[in-house]
């Protein structure tokens, strides 16, 4: 199972934090900091993208997860894409899933960068939700992921325009009716 997906930059500033296992808020911050410390100290040219972490990090209250927890990450430019998984997941499959995630983001944003993730967080979350739900992988076809997210974005843009039209109509009614409607547009 995938317990968490973390995207953070080289200054430990989170760009996406998604937990699929309940984790207390203070522990979420601690986990992010500890994962950052573990990853940022590694030399990616000679060390692998796989780390084993103590399972106590992902415990919630009296519940403790007894599986071996692994951190699987990939560095792209200034961002670390990090998946925290249990021992039931294949390390290479998760590494490939990170690549799929980044490829889908690249297609949605035309060469994704950190600012895209900051200002378009809804699309970022939509892409992730098309790939993973409830800690389980549901889609890995980049083309299908991008098509679904594009359709979702088109639908939300249409709803936003429709909402603006209603807002303009309401404003026109409250300001004296529709007689000056064309002049205000």
UniProtKB/Swiss-Prot annotation:
Key word Glycosyltransferase present: no
Presence of the UniProt keyword Nucleotide-binding in the record: no
One of the GO biological process terms: Golgi to vacuole transport
Predominant localisation class: Golgi
Pfam families with a match to the protein in the record: Clat_adaptor_s
Localization terms from the record: Golgi apparatus; Cytoplasmic vesicle membrane
PROSITE patterns given in the database record: CLAT_ADAPTOR_S
InterPro entries given in the database record: AP_complex_ssu, AP_mu_sigma_su, Clathrin_sm-chain_CS, Longin-like_dom_sf
One GO cellular component, as annotated: cytoplasmic vesicle membrane
Membrane topology annotation: Peripheral membrane protein
Top-level lineage group: Eukaryota
Keywords, in A-Z order: Cytoplasmic vesicle, Golgi apparatus, Membrane, Protein transport, Transport
Subunit structure: Adaptor protein complex 3 (AP-3) is a heterotetramer composed of 2 large adaptins (APL5 and APL6), a medium adaptin (APM3) and a small adaptin (APS3).
Family (UniProt): Belongs to the adaptor complexes small subunit family.
Function as written in the Swiss-Prot or TrEMBL entry: Part of the AP-3 complex, an adaptor-related complex which is not clathrin-associated. The complex is associated with the Golgi region as well as more peripheral structures. It facilitates the budding of vesicles from the Golgi membrane and may be directly involved in trafficking to the vacuole.
Family annotation (PANTHER family): ADAPTOR COMPLEXES SMALL SUBUNIT FAMILY
Descriptive protein name: AP-3 complex subunit sigma
UniProt source species: Eremothecium gossypii (strain ATCC 10895 / CBS 109.51 / FGSC 9923 / NRRL Y-1056)
Lineage start: Eukaryota, Fungi, Dikarya, Ascomycota, Saccharomycotina
Gene that this polypeptide is encoded by: APS3
């Amino acid at each position: 199972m995938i317990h968490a997906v973390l995207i953070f930059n080289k200054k430990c500033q989170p760009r996406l934090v998604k937990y699929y296992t309940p984790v207390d808020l203070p522990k979420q911050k601690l986990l992010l900091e500890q994962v950052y410390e573990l990853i940022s100290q590694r030399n990616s040219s000679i060390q692998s993208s796989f780390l084993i972490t103590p399972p106590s990090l992902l415990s919630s209250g009296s519940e403790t997860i007894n599986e071996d927890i692994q951190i699987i990450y990939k560095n792209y430019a200034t961002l670390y894409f990090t998946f925290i998984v249990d021992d039931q997941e294949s390390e290479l499959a998760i590494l490939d899933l990170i690549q799929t995630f980044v490829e889908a983001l690249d297609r949605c944003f035309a060469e994704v960068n950190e600012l895209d993730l900051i200002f378009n967080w809804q699309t970022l979350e939509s892409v992730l939700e098309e790939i993973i739900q409830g800690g389980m992988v549901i889609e890995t076809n980049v083309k299908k992921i991008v098509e679904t997210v594009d359709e979702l974005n088109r639908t939300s843009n249409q709803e936003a325009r429709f909402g603006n039209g209603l807002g303009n109509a309401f404003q026109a009614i409250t300001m004296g009716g529709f007689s000056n409607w064309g002049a205000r547009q």
